[in-house]
A protein has these predicted regions:
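Short catalytic/ligand-binding loop motif for oxyanion handling, primarily in non-cytosolic enzymes
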Residues: 17-20, 25, 87-89, 96-100, ...
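Active-site donor-binding segments of glycosyltransferases and PAPS-dependent sulfotransferases
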Residues: 86, 92, 99-127
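Charged phosphate-binding loop/patch that engages nucleotide di/tri-phosphates or the phosphate backbone
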Residues: 5-7, 156-192
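Short, acidic loop-to-helix structural element flanking the phosphoryl-transfer center
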Residues: 56-89, 96-102
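Active-site neighborhood of HAD-like aspartate-dependent phosphohydrolases
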Residues: 1-55
Length: 192
């Protein structure tokens, strides 16, 4: 069992895997104005006229298997381990995709190894996962109480995030300090 004071939860879609780019590339021929939105982290909300096409693309077999990694994602994952943390994927499944969990685990195994795939949390409720921090592109996470702190993975659509902690890509030099602070506060809350 992992020591929760060393676990860093990492979202998959938008943080490790370039979900939006895959959707945009698939839809560009028929939806030329679709792009990463500055207003919503959900493409189907930012472009409601394309909601059905987006659902068709993201629920297709092979969608998750074919995702490309976010720039420097593998280096960032390795850095977490080099810093002494235990990175764990914490990702939500898409209900409309019948093979979502299996494809996500396959993608993780190919990119990060079998252990990362095996240890991944593919759950609807990220709040229940133990750790000191959750690195996620979602602008805000409603979890009370939660053991972990939300670190926003910088994207155009989360600039208005209320989170005081922000990671500007995997090579952001603030990463070690963000995690050190999260671990210190986690241990204080736990009385360690």
């Amino acid at each position: 069992m992992a020591d929760s004071s060393l676990v860093v939860l990492v979202d998959m879609d938008g943080v490790l895997a370039d979900f939006d780019r895959a959707v945009i590339e698939a839809l560009k021929p028929t939806c030329p104005d679709i792009r990463v939105s500055a207003h919503s982290h959900r493409l189907h909300r930012a472009f409601p006229a394309y909601a059905e096409q987006i659902k068709t693309v993201t629920s297709a077999r092979g969608f998750f298997s074919g995702l490309k990694p976010v720039q420097h994602a593998v280096a960032g994952w390795r850095l977490l381990a080099e810093l002494g943390y235990q990175p764990r994927i914490c990702s939500s499944p898409l209900a409309a995709h019948p093979d979502c969990e299996a494809e996500k685990r396959g993608w993780l195994a190919d990119l990060l190894g079998e252990q990362a795939a095996f240890e991944a949390y593919i759950v609807r409720d990220k709040c229940s996962c133990p750790g000191i921090a959750l690195i996620d592109d979602i602008p805000s996470v409603e979890c009370e109480p939660s053991d972990w702190e939300h670190i926003v993975f910088d994207m155009p659509y989360n600039q208005q995030s209320p989170s005081a902690r922000r990671l500007r890509g995997w090579l952001d030099p603030k990463l070690p300090d963000l995690l050190l602070g999260a671990r210190r506060r986690y241990r204080q809350r736990a009385g360690q």
